[in-house]
A protein has these predicted regions:
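Short, hinge-like loop/turn segments at secondary-structure boundaries
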Residues: 64-65, 109, 134-138, 187-188, ...
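Glycine-rich beta-alpha junction loops
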Residues: 51-53, 123-125, 176, 200-206, ...
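Short coil/turn connectors at secondary-structure junctions
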Residues: 14, 41-45, 83-89, 111-116, ...
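Active-site diphosphate/adenylate-binding microenvironment
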Residues: 3-69
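Conserved thiamine diphosphate
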Residues: 134-186, 190
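Flexible, low-complexity linker and terminal segments
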Residues: 1-3, 14, 202-271
Length: 271
């Protein structure tokens, strides 16, 4: 069965706010189709966003929404889920919002296995504020705050969240929307624990222009060519993996989840 997800979009607000060529629209399409496939209702779904280009996503959704402060989307999402565990809570964060300014919240939400889904749009830059480097900007990359090349190594966010203890972690790219949608759908259907999707995205306006990566079609084709599966990556040496994007499911395990454990504590406390 094919899904279009239109009931979750405010069609009267289209086209999207984002720059021409931005991959956020592709990620949005994957999300709303996955929501429909997973049987979500707009009445029972809350989308939490932070600050940044990706933070504008909640403007276009018919679900409940909470537009939070920079780096704090996961704290808000945690509070909503604890207050009403029956809600489907989705946090949409960028690499600046979720992995850099909000990085500590990300680690601990994964460690606690808060029962929410987090979808990170990772375009390796702070797009809204002028193309500064973030915690995922690759070593050597040019940005408005690293004019002669970035001197820091980047986070592999999916590996970080996996190591922190999340129940489900997957990485996809806007070059393969069908695969990305499958990962998101699986995360939505997995009820217990912390679910994290890293969507590798493109920013032609800042990151692409600064690093002479061409326009959107060229950047998407570059993503496609540099992507390899986790299965293949396991048999490759570190130098062979340089510049590669390792896509696939990093972890998929059964956990109790924070809500279930919290309810058990409540029962014991009530005796």
């Amino acid at each position: 069965m094919r899904y279009n997800g239109k009931k979750f979009l405010k069609k009267e607000l289209l086209p999207f706010f984002w720059c021409s060529g931005c991959g956020n629209g592709i990620v949005m399409g994957c999300i709303v189709r996955a929501m429909e496939e997973s049987g979500f209702s707009k009445e029972n779904t809350v989308v939490v966003t932070g600050i940044g280009c990706w933070g504008k996503a909640d403007d276009y959704l018919t679900t409940h929404a909470f537009h939070g402060t920079h780096g704090r989307a996961l704290t808000i999402a945690t509070g909503i889920k604890l207050a009403n565990p029956s809600l489907e809570v989705i946090a949409l964060v960028g690499d600046g919002d979720g992995a850099t300014i909000g990085g500590n919240h990300l680690i601990h939400a994964a460690r606690r296995n808060i029962d929410i889904t987090v979808i990170m749009s990772n375009n390796f830059t702070y797009g809204m504020t002028g193309g500064q480097y973030s915690g995922t900007t690759p070593f050597g990359a040019i940005s408005s705050t690293s004019r002669y090349g970035h001197v820091e190594d980047e986070f592999d966010i999916s590996e970080l969240v996996k190591t922190a203890g999340a129940a489900y972690v997957a990485k996809g790219t806007v070059a393969n929307p069908l695969q990305l949608q499958r990962f998101i759908s699986k995360a939505f259907k997995k009820q217990n624990g912390f679910r994290f999707i890293e969507a590798i995205n493109i920013c032609p306006t800042h990151y692409g222009r600064a690093n002479q990566l061409g326009k959107a079609p060229e950047m998407i084709e570059s993503l496609r060519k540099s992507s390899i599966s986790i299965k293949l990556a396991k048999n490759m040496k570190p130098d062979e993996l340089a510049g590669k994007i390792v896509i696939g499911e990093y972890v998929d395990k059964k956990v109790d989840g924070y809500i279930r454990r919290y309810k058990e504590v409540q029962k014991r406390a009530a005796k």
